[in-house]
Amino acid sequence: MKNICLCFQMHSPYRLKRYRFFEIGHDHYYYDDMATEEHVNWLVETSYLPLCRTIKDMINLSKGKFHCAISISGTMIEMFEQFNPEMIDILKELAATKAVEFLATPYAYSLASEYNETEFKKQLKFQGELLETILGVKAQTVWNTELLYTDEFAYNLSKMGYKAILTEGAKHVLSWKSPNRVFQSAASPKMKVLLRNTGLSDELSFHFSDPNWANFPMDAEKYANMLQALPEGEDIINIWVGAETFGIRQNAGTGIFDFLKALPYYALEREMGFMTPAEAVKKLAAEDVLSSPYPLTWSGEAKDLSVYTGNDLQQEALNKLYAVAERVHLCQDKALKTNWLRLQDVNYLHNMNHIDQGETQYESAYDAFINYMNILSDFLQTVEEQYPTTIENEELNELLKTIRNQEEEIQKLNEKLKKAKK
């Protein structure tokens, strides 16, 4: 039996204000709140809210047979709480259906998994706690930033107790193999891997309303027929898109919401089912092995990290940012911790890309770099004031060790407290 795994990803960065060199050391607030609020409300009203309402209708109309997953960064949830609480309400309603899986993702939508393992673990923990507090759900499956995957990352995730990760079904990794099955990681056989079907996902994201595309006009019945026609034995079809596909990339006038709402009817009529990622890895056995020693993502033509790390500007920003990670981990200053998380957002790096900046407020990659580095310089000064570089590495390591031991002790006590309450 063929199963469809639909995932929708929600994230947007905080808008940075124009921050000039002479403000370094004087102005410690880096964000354009008005622009952020305006953008978040536009996302919610045009895309996210109508999408969530459509998903709820799909669950109800299918009598609970429609299942899907949503990936939301911690910073995105923060923005919903601050600027558009109606989104929190609809997400709670979806969580209550038990038909929607909410995925584990880095809190700040960062590259921490590549640059600082401790930071990545913290972010996954923070985001998981936020999902549990706000929505009452426990994240089981990992959607790393931009579907980032490496063998080493899969191994580290396995040590953390996770059993499944999502990534891109890129041709240079798959070769002749189909993405429509469950894989296991070459680095950790217990770690199951689901792969995005690039072609079928892009049918919705980029080609749905393109009159020059071979499958135009697309409708739910035609799409269901395409899925049904896939070879026997391809049991899980992973269609994962940015949530903004619905209402923004493909505006409501294209019929994209009607298409989505009708899909369960035509799929179920053809005896196809719907699964969340957690259900897929639980019910389906791994049939092949995935190996990718180098970063694999869903970004750009190369499906790697080059969009974010491919030039000297991006490398300088990343190296300077993560050079202070251990010192930031020592800090207790709430504002500093908040800035640390927000400044790791990969979208700021994307703005520094010479080739593909996408939609941006900056005139050039260099303009984006200068603005970000001015902000980063002020942030680094703040870190230096709290934990100067004059502190020897040995002393720093001892402080970190003490803090980690305290964190572990607190965690053990909290676990005992939870058991006692039960």
Positions of the model-derived regions?
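Acidic, His- and aromatic-enriched active-site or binding-groove loops in soluble protein domains
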Residues: M87-A104, V137, S158-S178, F183-L195
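Short, well-structured secondary-structure segments
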Residues: N3-F8, Y14-N116, Q140-W143, K163-E168, ...
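Distinct, well-ordered alpha-helical segments
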Residues: E81-N84, T150-S158
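Active-site and substrate-binding clefts of carbohydrate-active enzymes
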Residues: M1-S47, R181-M191, L195, D210-W213, ...
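Short, charged, surface-exposed secondary-structure boundary motifs
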Residues: S113-Y115, V173-R181, E203-S205, A286
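Short His-Asn-centered micro-motif
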Residues: W143-L147, T167-G169, L195-R196, W240-G242
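CE4/NodB-like, metal-dependent polysaccharide N-deacetylase domain
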Residues: E119-E146, N225-W240
